[in-house]
Amino acid sequence: MQTLQTTSLRVADNQLFILDQQALPQEKRWLDASTVEALVGHIHALRVRGAPLIGLSASLLLALLAENGHSRDQLAVALDTLRASRPTAVNLMNNLDRMKQALWQEDFVPALVTEALRLIEEDKQLCDAIARAGSQLVKPGSRLLTHCNTGGLATAGVGTALGVIAHAFAAGNVNNVWVDETRPLLQGGRLTAWELGELGVPYQLITDSMAASLMAKGQVDAVWVGADRIAANGDVANKIGTYSLAVLAKFHGIPFYVAAPQTTLDPHCPNGEAIPIEQRDAREVTGVAGSFGAVQWAPENAQVYNPAFDVTPAALISGWVLDTGVVLPEAVEQGVFKSSAV
């Protein structure tokens, strides 16, 4: 396969490398992800993360394994293993469905390579389209609040919600971005703050619990988040804490927008209750670890509830910004997401 580079993925010498997102921002470190076991380990540890990026990394790995001599049967097993690595992220399932179709073509090796590269290019185009559509909703002088990380680190392109923010900033319409730290793994404080700094976008970092105070003081004009899965009724699964922000935004009369590509839609999932929610390791809540070392602050035997995602009901969402344009609540109520052709 040709040499390839995105913000978080690299292909060189027919090997896949991922940017270690657990080491950022202190260290920019590339890790080998050239086996199924390695990539699944990176996904579980969130060294590679973001629904679009997970699907793209899995697709690239399958193509590289095919080029490196794996049989069709071996690739089928690898595909199923990768599919199970992150159950909430529907982009992974959608991408692997396309790779599975390529796998069963007669000349499956070039078919897999072509499909993986096509997915990368499509994601870049989807991100650009989302940014253009969403930036039309950002008014001059806006102070925006965002959650988790939805930029180039999570996609092959400019990102989803963060791509909208960057595009709107380039148009002169963003005065400030409130970045909530996004407990427990601090994707906002570590990754979004880093990306905004690289882009020159003015931001202020806050703890998650400060959002309500800012909204009450009139300091937030809109909330922008991404999505890991959008159900047929418009319910959205996203990083834990998204639902809290949606409730707060609704109470304070603040627009709450979800930015995602069509690959995040799941027309076969009727509502948020049907979305599987991953439960993660208690140690993510009882302490923190990074390139600086590890610290534990909770009692040794503390019982922990640690879902990776929550579900935001469609009734709390002002608009779903897709690569095809902005979808308003009225269209969702009429069933627009029940068909994959939005």
UniProtKB/Swiss-Prot annotation:
Residues annotated as catalytic: D228
A Pfam family assignment: IF-2B
BP-aspect Gene Ontology terms: L-methionine salvage from methylthioadenosine
Record-annotated membrane-spanning stretches: none
Catalysis performed (reactions): 5-(methylsulfanyl)-alpha-D-ribose 1-phosphate = 5-(methylsulfanyl)-D-ribulose 1-phosphate
Residues at which substrate binds: R49, G50, A51, R86, Q187, N238, K239
Coiled-coil ranges from the UniProt annotation: none
NCBIfam families, per the entry: eIF-2B_rel (TIGR00524), PRK05720.1 (NF004326), salvage_mtnA (TIGR00512)
Alphabetized HAMAP family for the sequence: Salvage_MtnA
Protein name per the record: Methylthioribose-1-phosphate isomerase
Taxonomic lineage from the root: Bacteria, Pseudomonadati, Pseudomonadota, Gammaproteobacteria, Enterobacterales
